[in-house]
């Protein structure tokens, strides 16, 4: 778990997200409070629950990106879900408890990957031994006993060095590999999740016991054998316990479009289902125990971050109990052309840097001038204002349009250095931007 201070967390987030300082401060404090809680004694630690966050702001201003980057900084299990995908218990659709099951699956994969990486060196040695067994089969007498072990040992040493150096990578061998277990998804009726989990485990166990002889190059075989040997070195039950603990103490759930499950205006039949989803979410956010195929997971200390545009509904349209479970509210501001200029140039791996790097692979040097950046940002702001405001996502559309000719004709372009200035941008965008009907459909 990260032990960074709030200011350090905000500084890290600044590398990827422009503006929205209030939201960054809120999530930085929430993450630091997790570290503070873990320093306390066990009894007091159980009493301190996370302060869930409600982000309010239009689309494309950085709500999801803030939560996603926060989870990466914390090295925590993270899942993003859309509130509209869930239905009240008894209706057709996904139940909210599947959020925790999916989060636990993510944690198991994450912990498993970390454990395998730690065992990779040992697994590599074992994989090399298996390949040597194929290359140097020990001689056996008529009764099946191994003989000439000294000669076999000498032969293994002879092959070991070129194997380590990769000199045998192109040589083909036949190898016995375990078949990858098939991941079978079974839709379960309400209340029968435990039986579904047992059926899934049974089918996966059956397929995991199968082996198949394959012919391949030693280089490819070595990679597969390293993964197989590393998997044998880790303890699945121990991994599950570590993953469940990670979910319970460090898990982050991001619920998007929470404003779409608000009841607003006059009541209708759909409002019943919307309010039902809120009531189903309530136990998860308050703290309950959810049954997963990996074990029981308590949600008391999982951090929930909800977000929504709240253009039609208001946060007060949420049921009072759910409002009370999101005590920290931050409003994210709409982005201006000045913000777009910064987004195009300042973040790590900014959009302009990405396009420069892509074209560099074709031997073309792209240079964005300051007035060119200003024109692109202005165009994005204008289209957002005239049509639908989709925030920073508009920059992807605008830039793709600006770069279209270069991307398509990259192999034919003789001029290997291209400057994108305001004149170039206007030439490629002016017709579309000035024609509102065209910009509505194309940009």
UniProtKB/Swiss-Prot annotation:
One of its GO terms (cellular component) is HslUV protease complex. The keyword Nucleotide-binding applies. Its main location: cytoplasm. CDD domains: RecA-like_HslU. Keywords: ATP-binding, Chaperone, Cytoplasm, Nucleotide-binding. Disulfide bonds: none annotated. It comes from the Bacteria. Pfam families: AAA, AAA_2. It is found in: Cytoplasm. GO terms for molecular function: ATP binding; ATP hydrolysis activity; peptidase activity; proteasome-activating activity. GO terms for biological process: protein unfolding; proteolysis involved in protein catabolic process. ATP binds at residues 18, 60-65, 256, 321, 393. ATPase subunit of a proteasome-like degradation complex; this subunit has chaperone activity. The binding of ATP and its subsequent hydrolysis by HslU are essential for unfolding of protein substrates subsequently hydrolyzed by HslV. HslU recognizes the N-terminal part of its protein substrates and unfolds these before they are guided to HslV for hydrolysis. A double ring-shaped homohexamer of HslV is capped on each side by a ring-shaped HslU homohexamer. The assembly of the HslU/HslV complex is dependent on binding of ATP. HAMAP family: HslU. Belongs to the ClpX chaperone family. HslU subfamily. This is ATP-dependent protease ATPase subunit HslU. It comes from Hamiltonella defensa subsp. Acyrthosiphon pisum (strain 5AT).
């Amino acid at each position: 778990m990260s032990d960074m201070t709030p200011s350090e967390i905000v500084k890290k987030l600044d590398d990827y997200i422009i503006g929205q300082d209030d939201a960054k401060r809120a999530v930085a404090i929430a993450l630091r409070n997790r570290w503070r809680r873990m320093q306390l004694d066990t009894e007091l630690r159980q009493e301190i629950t996370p302060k869930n966050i409600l982000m309010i702001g239009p689309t494309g201003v950085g709500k999801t990106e803030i939560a996603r980057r926060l989870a990466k900084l914390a090295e925590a299990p993270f899942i993003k879900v859309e509130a509209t995908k869930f239905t009240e218990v008894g209706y057709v659709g996904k139940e909210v408890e599947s959020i925790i099951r999916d989060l636990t699956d993510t944690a198991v994969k994450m912990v498993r990957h970390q454990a395998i990486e730690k065992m990779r060196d040992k697994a590599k040695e074992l994989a090399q031994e298996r390949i040597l067994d194929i290359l140097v089969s020990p001689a056996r007498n008529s009764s099946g006993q191994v003989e000439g072990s000294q000669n076999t040992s000498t032969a293994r040493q002879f092959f070991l060095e070129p194997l380590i150096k990769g000199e045998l990578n192109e040589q083909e061998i036949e190898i016995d590999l375990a078949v990858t277990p098939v991941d079978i998804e079974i839709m379960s009726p309400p209340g029968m999740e435990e039986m579904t989990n047992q059926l899934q485990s049974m089918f996966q166990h059956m397929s995991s016991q199968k082996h198949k002889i394959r012919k391949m190059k030693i280089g490819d075989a070595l990679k597969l054998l390293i993964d197989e040997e590393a998997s044998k070195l880790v303890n699945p039950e121990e991994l599950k316990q570590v993953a469940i603990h990670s979910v319970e103490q460090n898990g982050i759930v991001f619920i998007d479009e929470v404003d779409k499950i608000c009841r607003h205006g006059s009541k209708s039949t759909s409002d019943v289902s919307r309010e039902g989803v809120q009531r189903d979410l309530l136990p998860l956010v308050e703290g309950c125990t959810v049954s997963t195929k990996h074990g029981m997971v308590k949600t008391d200390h999982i951090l929930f971050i909800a977000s929504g545009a709240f253009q039609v509904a208001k946060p007060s349209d949420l049921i009072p109990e759910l409002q009370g479970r999101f005590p920290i509210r931050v409003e994210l501001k709409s982005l201006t052309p000045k913000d777009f200029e910064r987004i195009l140039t300042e973040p790590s791996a900014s959009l302009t840097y990405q396009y420069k790097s892509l074209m560099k692979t074709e031997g073309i040097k792209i240079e964005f001038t300051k007035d060119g950046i200003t024109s692109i940002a202005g165009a994005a702001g204008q289209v957002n204002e005239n049509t639908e405001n989709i925030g920073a996502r508009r920059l992807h559309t605008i830039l793709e349009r600006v770069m279209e000719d270069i991307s398509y004709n990259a192999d034919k372009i003789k001029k290997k250095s291209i400057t994108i200035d305001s004149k170039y941008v206007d030439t490629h965008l002016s017709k579309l931007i000035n024609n509102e009907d065209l910009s509505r459909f194309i940009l």
